[in-house]
Swiss-Prot record:
L-aspartate binds at residues 87, 182, 253. It comes from Prochlorococcus marinus (strain NATL1A). This is Aspartate carbamoyltransferase catalytic subunit. The gene is pyrB. One of its GO terms (biological process) is 'de novo' pyrimidine nucleobase biosynthetic process. NCBIfam families: asp_carb_tr, PRK00856.1.
Length: 339
């Protein structure tokens, strides 16, 4: 793992193809540990990992906690409801308290974009030996989700040896609230870097023309590797057109808490036009897996029947793979810590 250069994990835009390979290889190894009878390794024994979630979370926070414990780390979970924030303390002062307590890794989720990046900058400027791991900031980035989705798809396409090449030339369609989705952005970086062709689909209000600026980022898609032309991104408005010849489909939750008024006509109309169902999947012209990062709104972005059809959806696999993926990230960051 000597090629790992990151002191923080903030955004997958900074990842090289070698970084993705490293994470996938480690995740494969840690998945075996996670499934073993002992379930634990002493890799991060004595390290302190603090989970600071300033935004509600169930799956991600629990997944990070289990991942840290599987590596034998000491874990502290921050709760907004029982914190000094209610007494007027700022989030920065709360975070600095954990740094003063000797936290080796801070796992941070915040509703505002770039909070983890600003904290990482503060840590670096002040030469503090603490790593920052972004667990989701606004609708900017969610790197661990992008990586676990990458691993889930790589494992589906190549169960015996999941790798970055498992995604090469695969057609992945992402449907839904792209505008407000940090998951979509992280998946775009990961999937295109590994050579996938990604199609985005959603109503104009949730996939506006301005998003094309993100898609045309000079480091995204085929521009990431101009020699091998790895990856590409397309935008389509018609669900039927978007699903045609897809190898996998990811549907996203409508983030109503982030939406402005009148961004959607109504939920029934949205479901009729963009809902993923057994019937709409026929447009793929073959049996394909369906992913959803959760939480799921049944009957809005995905049918109730499809949520319960484990022969098609990989939702439980995504949750399962979240633990070894986050073990890999914590392990890599923990390796850089000085005693």
């Amino acid at each position: 793992m000597n090629n790992w250069k990151h002191n923080h994990v903030l955004d997958l835009s900074t990842f090289s193809l070698e970084d993705y390979k490293t994470v996938l290889e480690l995740t494969t190894r840690f998945k075996d540990v996670h499934k073993s009878s002992s379930k634990k390794l002493p890799a991060l024994h004595g390290r302190l990992i603090a989970n600071l979630f300033f935004e509600p979370s169930t799956r991600t926070r629990t997944s990070f906690e289990l991942a840290a414990k599987r590596l034998s780390a000491d874990v502290q979970n921050f709760s907004v409801s029982s914190s000094s924030l209610s007494k007027g303390e700022t989030p920065l002062d709360t975070i600095l308290t954990y740094i003063s307590m000797g936290a080796d890794i801070l796992v941070i989720r915040h509703e505002s974009t770039n909070v983890p990046a600003e904290l990482a900058n503060y840590v670096d400027i002040n030469n503090i030996n603490t790593s920052i791991l972004n667990a989701g900031d606004g609708f900017h980035s969610h790197p661990s989700q992008g990586l676990l989705d990458l691993f889930t798809l790589a494992t589906f396409f190549n169960p015996n040896e999941p790798s970055t090449n498992s995604l090469l030339n695969k057609k992945i369609t992402i449907v839904g609230d792209i505008l407000h989705s940090r998951v979509a952005r992280s998946n775009l970086w990961a999937l295109t870097a590994c050579g996938a062709e990604v199609t985005l689909c959603g109503p104009p209000s949730l996939l506006p023309e301005e998003f094309i600026d993100f898609v045309q980022n000079p480091r995204l898609g085929q521009n990431f590797d101009p020699i091998n032309k790895r990856g590409s991104v397309f935008i389509k408005r018609s669900l039927k057109d978007a699903l045609k010849n897809s190898d996998a489909v990811m549907t996203l939750r409508l983030q109503k808490e982030r939406m402005k008024q009148n961004m959607l006509k109504d939920l029934d109309s949205y479901y009729a036009q963009y809902g993923i169902t057994h019937e709409s999947l026929k447009w793929c012209e073959k049996k394909v897996p369906v992913l959803h990062p959760g939480p799921v709104n049944r009957g809005v972005e995905i049918s109730n029947r499809l949520v319960e059809d484990n022969s098609i959806n990989l939702i439980s696999k995504q949750v399962e793979n979240g633990i070894p993926t986050r073990m890999a990230l914590l392990y890599l960051l923990g390796l850089n810590k000085k005693d």
